[in-house]
Structure formats: C-alpha cells, structure tokens
C-alpha cells in the first residue's frame, strides 16, 4: 500500500497544512499583534476587527454564526461545529421552536488610525446613577396573582377583573441584592448589601462587562485547539451526568460563550440534575421537559418556583428572593395575562405539563425577562441554599471564577491561559471524585436495602416458625431477639420437616445485618 501524502500545492491538502501551520503561528501571538501583522488570519477565522464598528461608513456587523467563519478550518471542524452565541439585535425576539438568547457584545470605536484599544480587564465599575428601583416595596408571590391561575385554565382575559388573591410578604432578611435593568447593548449588574428588606445598607456599585466578540472568537480558537482533550472530557462528564453542582454552575455561567457541543452537554447535565430532584418536589417535570428542549436561559433552571415574586402595583419587575438573596430583574414583557406567546409551538408543548400556579410563574419568569436573565448571578443564589461555593469577589458576579475572564482578555502567549487548563483539570478531578462517591453511595444504599428486606422478612415470618423449645425462653422484642440455651438445634419448617441448622448464630447474624 502506497503511503498517503498531502499535495501542498493545491486543493484541500494545501489548506489543511496551511491551517496547521498558521495555528502554531498564532499560538504565541496576541489578538492585537495578529491584527497588526497578519490581518488576513483574523479575516479568515472570522475574527476580523473591522467587521464590527460604530464608525460611520465602516462595514456593519453581519449577523452570522461563528461556525460559518470556522468551516474552512480542518483542525476544529468537528470540535467547533457551531458556536451558538447570538448577536445583539435591536428587533424584538421572535419566539419559535427554540428561542434565540441574545448575547450583547461591547462595540468599540476606532480611532483615526483604525486601531482599537481593548481594555486589559473586561469588567469595570461605572459611576452609580440614581434610578427608579423597587426598594421599600412589598413582595407577593407571582403564583398568587389570580390571572396567573386563570392562565392555567386558559380563561378569558376579562376574568382578571375578579377579586385578587395576592398577598404581601418578603422572605428576605439580609444579604446581597442584585438589580438587572433593561440596558440597550450594555451588560450592567448593580449590587449592594442589605441588612434588611427595606433597602440598601451599602453604597450600590454598578459593574459593566465588556466582551469583545472578535477577541473572544480568537481566544476560543486558540484554547479549544490547545486544550481539546480536556474540553472533550468535560463534555463527556457533563453528558453522562457525572459533574457535581459546583462544576455544573461554573460552566453554566460560561454557556453563552461555549461552542455547541459543550452547550448541548450542559443542557443534558441540567436536565439530568432536575430530573433527579423531581421526586422530592423541588423541581417539576415542566422544567425537565423545557430543559430538554433548550428553552429559555439555562441559568434560570436552578431557580425554584417558590422563590419567584413580583411587586405590588408593578408589572415590569420580577424578583427572585430567598432569606439571604434578592435579585430584581426588569422584564422586557410586562407581567400581564397576554404575556405568554401561545402561538409558540414549544410553549404549546409545555402547557399541558403545567399543573400549578407556581409552575406558571416559572414560565412567566423565562418568557418575560428575555435576555436580561442571562446575567442572573445564579452562583450567589445557589450558595444561599447549599453553601458549597467559596466566597467570590464582587467583580466575579458575572462568572464563578476569575480565570474565566481570560476568555475576554488579549494575551500574547498561550501559556498565559494555563490557569484555564488548571481549572479544567480541577473540575475533571472533582467529576472523578463525584463519580466514585456516588458509586459508593449507590452500593451502600443497595446494601442497606438488602438488610431492610432481610429484617422485614424476619418480622413477617417469625410467628410462623416453630421452635423446639419453650416460648418463654425467647424475649418478645423482635428487634433485639436474644436466646437462652436452646433445647435443640432443629428448626421446624412450614411443611413440618426438620433441618439441622445452628439456629442461634443464624438468626442473630440475620438480625444484626
């Protein structure tokens, strides 16, 4: 058999070798250096900075998916099949079979030399601006609104004029409060510490997250090509439901910036997580079905319907509240009877699964908050319930770990991203440990179940056993049977036959198991 060789002079062979060569070249080249010395590479990989700009007369931003830019690259053809980040769009989102989650990117303007100064850190604090907030207002469970109950029955909208069953409460005692407003083309998260439910106790701070899309594409290509095995192993762990909650939350918060194979793995892991907790009533089948359909934003699937509230006489804010956590999300659709788009095929599929007003409240949370939910600090919310996550810096409200911000920073060498690989390996170690622990617990449960079955059989059958000695020689407590000196070692069976068994060791061994 002749050895297969690549013809470097023409066709796909030349393109493959070119991609491999250029990958090693950009491995040690920052985004800004590549834009200065090899702009054709940025253009080839869809990372051309000139595609996105707000300067008049410059090319407008094209609404394409990243996989279209990468389809010529052989190295990541299977790995990077689709990167489903959706681009900022001023038009109202169209609800179809699968919702398009908007990811807002920072639009940088060019200077006179057509250069962009990318900030070294993608998060900055901006001056606080006093704005209308729902502080000092009572909360009511969203599920307690009468029109929410009417939605389940599909009653006419005229019925909402009937007596309202809402009631006021506020479970919040103290802790962090977050506010997510409608901000066109900006990612802002307001936070403060509150000592009680009446308002702010510390000066609020507003952080802005500034992801630059071409830089993200460039870094993603470098990272996914360099650490391909680690990302694939992570995908397998997520798909097989072998990731603990901390690992799952870590990568859920990066969902919008991951390629499609990791996004699909995250949806599978989340749906498995929810399905395991349906039996205890924490979540419902509605959430499991919606997760399998990739409906809405993945962060809100960890919110229990009991924690969803709204405000008295206010239909454009929704709140997620626990004893030590409070988040106000400004809705893009008003909380009204006709908020649910019943013409959406996916919602039509989910509607038969809604059996309570609380489930309807969760569906309203998904539909009405729209893309604002993408920045819900789910790690802070989860930590008030589980306490499994370590305290984080306020600058990490957007993500779980500080190393995650490296995806959005311009670094010269690929070695500067080693901390990302370190975190990936730590997550994989946690997954392995979680698998071993869960297997040990499963075996222990099986052993305990066998013991309980044995005890139950003894309790049900002990009265049918005829002992060849007087009954007063046995204490009546079945749970602690003790034997005096047996008269014989013969055991009378149901068919009146006898078998020679060491009776005392047998029963004591069975009951002590």
Swiss-Prot record:
Pfam families for the chain: UPF0300
Gene Ontology biological-process annotations: meiotic cell cycle
Source species, domain of life: Eukaryota
A single Gene Ontology CC term: vacuolar membrane
Cystine bridges: none
Compartments, record wording: Golgi apparatus; Vacuole membrane
Principal localisation: Golgi
Alphabetical UniProt keywords: Golgi apparatus, Meiosis, Membrane, Vacuole
Entry's family note: Belongs to the UPF0300 family.
Function: Has a role in meiosis.
Protein name: Meiotically up-regulated gene 133 protein
């Amino acid at each position: 058999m002749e050895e297969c060789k690549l013809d470097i002079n023409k066709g796909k062979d030349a393109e493959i070798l070119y991609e491999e060569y250029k990958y090693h070249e950009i491995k040690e080249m920052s985004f800004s250096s590549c834009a200065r010395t090899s702009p054709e590479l940025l253009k080839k990989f869809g990372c051309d900075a000139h595609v996105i700009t707000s300067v008049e007369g410059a090319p407008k931003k094209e609404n394409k998916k990243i996989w279209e830019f990468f389809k010529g690259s052989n190295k990541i053809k299977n790995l990077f099949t689709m990167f489903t980040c959706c681009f900022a769009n001023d038009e109202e989102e169209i609800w179809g079979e699968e919702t398009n989650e908007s990811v807002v990117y920072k639009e940088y303007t060019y200077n006179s030399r057509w250069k962009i100064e990318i900030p070294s850190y993608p998060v900055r604090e901006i001056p606080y601006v006093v704005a209308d907030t729902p502080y000092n207002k009572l909360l009511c469970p969203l599920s307690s609104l009468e029109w929410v109950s009417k939605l389940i029955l599909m009653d006419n909208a005229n019925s909402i004029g009937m007596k309202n069953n809402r009631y006021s409460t506020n479970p919040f005692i103290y802790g962090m409060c977050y506010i997510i407003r409608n901000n066109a083309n900006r990612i802002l998260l307001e936070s403060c510490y509150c000592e009680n439910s009446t308002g702010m106790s510390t000066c609020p701070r507003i952080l802005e997250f500034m992801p630059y899309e071409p830089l993200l594409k460039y870094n993603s290509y470098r990272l996914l090509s360099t650490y391909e095995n680690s990302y694939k192993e992570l995908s397998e762990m997520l798909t097989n439901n072998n990731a603990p909650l901390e690992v799952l939350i870590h990568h859920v918060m990066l969902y919008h910036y991951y390629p499609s194979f990791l996004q699909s793995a995250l949806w599978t892991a989340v749906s498995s997580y929810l399905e395991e907790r349906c039996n205890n009533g924490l979540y419902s089948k509605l959430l499991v079905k919606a997760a399998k359909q990739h409906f809405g934003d993945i962060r809100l699937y960890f919110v229990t319907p009991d924690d969803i509230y709204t405000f008295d006489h206010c239909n454009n804010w929704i709140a997620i509240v626990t004893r030590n956590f409070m988040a106000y999300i400004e809705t893009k659709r008003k909380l009204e009877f006709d908020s649910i788009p019943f013409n959406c095929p996916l919602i039509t599929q989910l509607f038969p699964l809604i059996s309570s007003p609380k489930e309807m409240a969760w569906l309203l949370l998904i539909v009405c908050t729209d893309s604002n939910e993408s920045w819900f600090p789910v790690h802070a919310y989860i930590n008030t319930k589980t306490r499994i996550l370590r305290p984080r810096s306020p600058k990490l409200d957007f993500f779980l770990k500080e190393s995650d911000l490296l995806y959005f920073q311009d670094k010269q060498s690929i070695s500067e991203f080693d901390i990302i690989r370190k975190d990936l390996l730590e997550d994989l170690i946690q997954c392995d440990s979680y698998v071993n622990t869960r297997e040990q617990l499963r075996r222990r449960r099986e052993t305990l179940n066998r013991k309980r079955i044995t005890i139950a059989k003894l309790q049900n059958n002990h009265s049918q056993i005829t002992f060849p000695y007087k009954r007063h020689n046995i204490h009546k407590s079945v749970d602690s049977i003790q034997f005096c000196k047996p008269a014989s070692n013969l055991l009378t069976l149901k068919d009146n036959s006898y078998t020679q068994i060491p009776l005392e060791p047998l029963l004591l061994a069975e009951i002590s198991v």
